[in-house]
Amino acid sequence: MRASGILMPVFSLPGPFGIGTLGAEAFAFVDFLARARQTYWQILPIGPTGYGDSPYQSFSAFAGNPYFIDYRVLAEDGWLTPDEVPAPVPVGTVDYGALYNERPVILKRAADRLLAEPSKAYTDFCAAQDFWLDDYALFMALKAEQGQAGLADWPDALRTREPSALAAAHVRLADAVDYHKAVQFFFFTQWSALKTYANQKGIQLVGDIPIYVSPDSSDLWTRPELFQTDGQVHLTQVAGCPPDAFAADGQLWGNPLYDWPRHEAEHFAWWKRRMKHATSIYDVVRIDHFRGFESYYSIPAGNTTAAGGKWVKGPDRAFIDAMHEALGQGGIIAEDLGYLTPEVKTMLAASGYPGMKIMQFAFDSREPGNYLPYTYTRNSVVYTGTHDNVTTEGWRATASPEDVHYACRYLRCTPKDLTEAMIAACLSCVSDMAIIPMADWLHLGAEARINTPSTQGSNWQWRLTTPLTSLLADHIADLTVLYDRTPAAE
């Protein structure tokens, strides 16, 4: 079925609290998508973020980001009084430092009210999520007690989960543990309401999960034996990407690598649980760095660049078979960008999952792969660019003149019309699904870039300040109809 959608991170939504939330503006964006006759809203990972603010480095593979909780909804639900809701602030880029200082104070007031007389909805939530919630809450409480130190720097007894140390921490930090559980209840209550509304409007939520967990995460702390660690929960090998035309030293991500033989011995139980959780909160799930299941780039822990790494065989078809057994064969998007060997292509074909196509890459002379539209298959998802790309207007301004000229020749347009032509090329191509970043529909420049890989500083901060008008929605709808991507219900 041909369909289309828009890529828009939750944090990029407008709103009065310094970051996009799950409140009124999220519901208004669903309305905009429905008027534009879209089928999908693709977001970025929604887990709690830490140093660097990357949603791909979260404290948990299961938890939700407290920054996305909407204060107005908490007040409507009786967990805050109206005068406890902060005064609106102008919509600008996300200031994570301000959120870090303000959010816990206000959320604690709401949590205290909930915990004074826990509701059945809260106790039911805790029971349903017990496979991750208790460990996550204790991890966050301990992290605060340790001055926000990373897991690697915790005292040995806590890092290695000595039973007596954990028992004492549960008693000592009981209030903090309950606070973090309450905050997760608030998040998932609001998330559920948004998803229900979106689905009623015919909009499906496309979630995004990183293949790897963070080195500073409750996931690593809780099950270190599932990762390549020594006996003291220190990493022995870390994840990354080898050098290429875009990064001379490669990319040193620093994430824990999985101990795949251990996962396979457990019939991939942890991954099955992770994916079942993801499919319960999203309608479609994009798995980042999908090729890492066939083989992964392994870098010795402590290396300062990725140049000294090597490729190591992953679980390959055994993992795919386990996911098919647990989830069936639909509802997954495989991010298959980058270095693809014949073995990776064989694994992707066996999975049945659609891969990704990036229209910008088609005209980038540094890109060794062929991303021209004539190479696409129906079972794929096409983007002008993703969160890791500059906007198409930004690409036009920064790409080599030769690349821009080639794109304009191929798409039969002038440079001024390149963004609209690239969008049309995506919508008109054979790929079953087309996803266009919101910033491209608005023809925004490099100031709207979400992330520049291998950099720190101004990433994950862009927010929408341009009004989403009915005129724009109707323009999107017109092209959606023209290229036969209207929702199935129509």
Regions found by a protein language model. Give the residues of each.
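Surface-exposed amphipathic alpha-helices with a cationic face
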Residues: 34, 191-199, 324, 348-349
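Catalytic domains of carbohydrate-active enzymes, especially glycoside hydrolases
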Residues: 24-49, 277-282
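Alpha-amylase-like alpha-glycosidases and glucanotransferases acting on alpha-linked glucans and related
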Residues: 9, 53-184, 188, 213-435, ...
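Short alpha-helical segments and helix-capping/turn motifs at coil-helix boundaries
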Residues: 24-31, 189-197, 271-273, 418-422
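Domain-scale activation on soluble regions of proteins
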Residues: 35, 158-159, 165, 462, ...
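Outer-envelope exported proteins of Gram-negative bacteria
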Residues: 44, 204-206, 210, 284, ...
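Conserved, well-ordered alpha-helix/loop/beta-strand core segments that scaffold catalytic motifs
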Residues: 180-213
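Mature N-terminal, pre-catalytic/accessory segment of carbohydrate-active enzymes
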Residues: 1-37
